[in-house]
Regions:
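Ubiquitin-like/PB1-type beta-grasp interaction modules and other compact soluble beta-rich domains
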Residues: 1-92
């Protein structure tokens, strides 16, 4: 199974500049996708998940356009060919 992870520029720098990263997760959940992403890009994984392995509060993750916070979190099913978009919150004033 192959999943495409879409990253904004601020996170793409941690993936060698790639805004589109393809991963082959060991399973079929978002957690498996993030494990595979972290395996390829450890620094990126630490920006997305906290020390307990949960998605950080200021990071929004979407599977095929659906916010995972409302669809099972890390247990959200991910299909072959899915797009996972990772968007960190931006604050300023």
């Amino acid at each position: 199974m192959t999943v495409q992870v879409l990253l904004p520029g601020v996170l793409a720098t941690l993936a060698g500049g790639d805004k589109h990263v393809h991963v082959e997760p060991a399973g079929t959940t978002l957690g498996d996708v993030l494990d595979a992403l972290e395996s390829q890009h450890p620094m990126l994984g630490r920006r997305i998940r906290d020390e307990t392995g949960q998605v950080r509060r200021f990071v929004n993750v979407y599977v095929d356009g659906d916010d995972v916070r409302f669809n099972g979190g890390l247990a959200t099913p991910v299909r072959d060919g899915a797009e996972v978009q990772v968007l960190p919150s931006v604050a300023g004033g």
